[in-house]
Amino acid sequence: MTAEDSIAAMSSSSAAGSSAKVPEGVAGAPNEAALLALMERTGYSMVQENGQRKYGGPPPGWEGPHPQRGCEVFVGKIPRDVYEDELVPVFEAVGRIYELRLMMDFDGKNRGYAFVMYCHKHEAKRAVRELNNYEIRPGRLLGVCCSVDNCRLFIGGIPKMKKREEILEEIAKVTEGVLDVIVYASAADKMKNRGFAFVEYESHRAAAMARRKLMPGRIQLWGHQIAVDWAEPEIDVDEDVMETVKILYVRNLMIETTEDTIKKSFGQFNPGCVERVKKIRDYAFVHFTSREDAVHAMNNLNGTELEGSCLEVTLAKPVDKEQYSRYQKAARGGGAAEAAQQPSYVYSCDPYTLAYYGYPYNALIGPNRDYFVKAGSIRGRGRGAAGNRAPGPRGSYLGGYSAGRGIYSRYHEGKGKQQEKGYELVPNLEIPTVNPVAIKPGTVAIPAIGAQYSMFPAAPAPKMIEDGKIHTVEHMISPIAVQPDPASAAAAAAAAAAAAAAVIPTVSTPPPFQGRPITPVYTVAPNVQRIPTAGIYGASYVPFAAPATATIATLQKNAAAAAAVYGGYAGYIPQAFPAAAIQVPIPDVYQTY
């Protein structure tokens, strides 16, 4: 080997080594050089997996546990050609980045959104406050908001006799990362659960893996099929706001427990400290005059028994006024929010108790959520108990129970609108209904056919219900139910023809076009000679005003009677129901003017 060959081999090996250091997802990227320069400057690693490119996680020199919940923000409306080399300098200006996950597409471009996790919660809040609507490109603004790191699963189909310890042990056998199990006791029988539980996991990834493993049809618990879905995430309230709360949320009460009993129990430490108590089924809100009294009562009564039931007492979580107004505006379909009708914040309740007892859901939850929240103003996939969404503030007592319109907004929204009136088929006819749809008499009249054509007199509709019944029997049921005598069919046909000839005059010369009456219409079979007639009506023509005889003959399939009615003309095809007029395709029509 010559010196030149050795130098070439060394250069090729060094080039191969340098290319091997480029991580997957960065090699071949449109801005590969810029990404490599970013990694060299910050010392963060970068790798692509599961359709996302991770920058950091953890950062270099990190020691300690994973950042707590609330440290991650969601970044949306990212231009498709913007990558980490432009995003990192913007977001690291407000705090130290623990991890940045940019969602990638197959073509190498981003999918328009990313997740940025900071080392501390206050840094994430600062990012939302300062970087929302940040102009990353001319005319392109970023959307930054707090990310919901949901670590809780809803599991239904649990036997009601199982205890919390049994459920925790069984779930821990089939999934990993289980931290806690929340089980709600039945209000009627405290020895039973409500058939569902909430499982808390150590991370969102662990919860997602458990959800995939527990999907229906894969695993059975205690020999039962289970239902698994994401639980409604807990409301993350600012710590400064929680420091001002002086309302306690008390759950696991007995149904028989009264508000006076609760007020007496919570006011025993300082007489007169309880302003009011509102109880709904097995939970209640206790309002105090001061926060100190509320905290003191919570510390002393949490876990104690009241009338044989173990109480769970916590501070009520408020919803800020701005969010409440935004929800109200969305529920009204984008209308302007009314000025300060509500207090500074409304207090949420136990959504699972509300869902269990089937209270009417307010405008932001329940089966009519899509009707009240117009244009998709509020979105989300989280679920609460039994697949129901957690209650929001609209139409509820402090976010707790229905306080007015609620699900009945359809009725209120329908007021004041002009309703279409029905046709007055039978005036003053009262019809007993078996459904909520009522038939209302209106003022719109249907013109009678006899007013235009005198040869077809329209029978007036009877106004009494008994006469209506008789009219129905005579003109609808009789032609089908009566069995005619074949021997008298010819006589009946002759009588009908005579009556028709007596009622309808024969006209030799038609009147002018404007006064021309309706001419008879004959349906003629193909290849059959037409009927010659001298007048406007044939001798055997049977008007629609008296169709009973022809109908009976047709329904009974009596060819002789049918031929007798229509003058023995075999080519005539009678209608089975002449009252419906001629609506079928007619091969040939013969009209005489």
Curated annotation (Swiss-Prot):
Annotated region (Disordered), positions in chain: 1-24
One GO cellular component term: cytoplasm
Residue ranges annotated for the RRM domain, each copy included: 71-149, 151-233, 246-318
Coiled-coil segments: none
Keyword Protein transport in annotation: no
GO MF entries: RNA binding
Keyword Iron-sulfur found: no
Cellular localization per UniProt: Nucleus; Cytoplasm
Post-translational modification Omega-N-methylarginine, affected residues: 332, 394, 405
Subunit structure: Homodimer. Interacts with A1CF. Interacts with APOBEC1; form an mRNA editing complex. Interacts with RBPMS.
NCBIfam families, per the entry: hnRNP-R-Q (TIGR01648)
PANTHER family with a match to the protein in the record: HETEROGENEOUS NUCLEAR RIBONUCLEOPROTEIN (PTHR21245)
Domain remark text: The RRM domains are required for mRNA stabilization.
Protein name as catalogued: RNA-binding protein 47
Protein species of origin: Pongo abelii
